[in-house]
Amino acid sequence: MSIPADLLYTDTHEWVRIEGDEAVIGITQFAQEQLGDLTFVDLPAVGDTLATGQEMGSVESVKAASELYSPLAGTVSAVNDALSGAPELVNQSPYTDGWMVRVKLSATPEGLLSAADYEAVVAREAH
């Protein structure tokens, strides 16, 4: 399983790419593999304000439904509208085409995991 070293992670299986004063968020390859084929993605609206740890949407698959949690605080500046018609993009390409939201940061993100630390989380949960 691929865990890109240039991203940050949460123990709830979201990934974060910091780009200046914004961050792009999605779910990890491990998360989408556990869920199976996604059938629906519910995302926040552009302009919504998110707090760290706040529920910001959900994903549904053939196997389960799962909430999405914001790993940081800020205002949603973009959502991946392609996912409403093609949720399978998350399965096919979780770190690129399957991104979910872009957030303008209101505070420096804290408590995010490095790729190595996230790999340890995945190893614990995979057993």
Curated annotation (Swiss-Prot):
Per the entry, the cofactor note is: Binds 1 lipoyl cofactor covalently.
Which residues does this entry mark as bearing N6-lipoyllysine?
A: 63
Cofactor requirements of the protein: (R)-lipoate
GO biological process per UniProt? glycine decarboxylation via glycine cleavage system
Lipoyl-binding domain residues are 22-104
Where is coiled-coil annotated? none
Record HAMAP family: GcvH (MF_00272)
Write out the similarity annotation: Belongs to the GcvH family.
Which protein is depicted?
Glycine cleavage system H protein
